[in-house]
Amino acid sequence: MGAVARAIKSLEPQLGWSRRTSGSHGSPRYIEDHVHGMICGPGGAESRYDIQLGFSLMAPHTRYPDHHHPPEEAYVLLTPGEFRQQGGEWFDPGIDGGIHNEPHHVHAMRSGKTPFLAIWSLLT
């Protein structure tokens, strides 16, 4: 994990940073306790609109709100974390595990006792 953290740190000045500020069922401090880094996509190190590649970082015990969007999306977990799709049960795909979200499907993610870090991609 140290190598991944160093790689992200080296890209930090070029990344587009953002936070989600709306959504239902997020933990009380989720706005302060999460950030997205855009590597490739609008505002990222490489600005393009056909694909987005970035990562999500959340503090321990943070629940990201239920949300949905038109593009399909894939995540690969670099740390422990859980996902929920379409109001179903929470599940942990495991470190190096992945998840795919269909277009417009409601989904959410949450961290446990450790920080959450995942790489994601949206096909726009």
PLM feature segments, named:
Residues 58-60, 65-95:
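A short beta-strand-loop-beta hairpin characteristic of the jelly-roll/cupin
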Residues 35-42, 51-69, 103-104:
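Conserved short histidine dyad/triad with adjacent acidic residue
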Residues 38-40, 54-56, 75, 84, ...:
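Residues in well-ordered beta-strands of folded domains
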Residues 1-49:
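A short, N-terminal "cap"/entry segment at the start of jelly-roll beta-barrel domains
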Residues 70, 104-124:
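Ligand-binding loop in jelly-roll beta-barrel domains
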Residues 47-48, 53, 91:
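Short hydrophobic/aromatic segments of transmembrane alpha-helices and their interfaces
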